[in-house]
Amino acid sequence: MDEEMVEENMTNHDAPAESCPMPRASEAPADDVLTLILARSRSVAVVGASPHPDRTSHAVCTWLMNHTPFELYLVNPNAGDADIEGHGFYASLADVPAAPDIVVVFRRSEEVPAVAVDAVAADAAVLWMQLGIDNEIAAATARAAGMDVIENRCIKVEYARLRDQIAAAAVA
């Protein structure tokens, strides 16, 4: 890959989440890997879920509640008594009553290492960083604990895109 392409990829990679950057090839897991992760998972904790309807995390949580079989746990220490479609919030991953299969992160990249440590302590299987979010330290922490790591991908987009494959894998 020439320097111009590398620079272009880095520029796109560093763009804010709202611009929906495409993941770099090195961090984009194959569709069969994503399919297996999503088909085998039963519970998802969303760290940084927002009770505010104008936030992306709120829209993603609402979609997951209405279009997937996942048991959803919303994590936000500042949400108080708020809810999303009847789902209340937990102050931390440690407060979630069961080990989540997937921990989805809607936090700034620099805050993800602490979330990774919490995800390991919660015995999660997957650390999933949403669009525009990646962190090498967090990824290394999760991988060292045997977790799968997904960076810079939207769980809603991937689930919708792979819906048929997920359904087939769940039956198999």
Write out the residue ranges for each language-model feature.
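NAD(P)-binding Rossmann-fold cofactor-contacting core
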Residues: 51-55, 62-84
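Rossmann-fold NAD(P)-binding glycine/threonine-rich loop
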Residues: 131-159
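A charged, well-structured terminal subsegment
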Residues: 158-172
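Short N-terminal or domain-adjacent regulatory/targeting segments
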Residues: 11-41
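A short helix->loop->beta-strand "cap" motif at the edges of active sites that frequently abuts
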Residues: 67-71, 122-127, 145-147
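Active-site regions of enzymes building and remodeling cell-envelope glycoconjugates
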Residues: 85-93
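Mid-chain, well-packed structural core segment of small domains
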Residues: 93-133
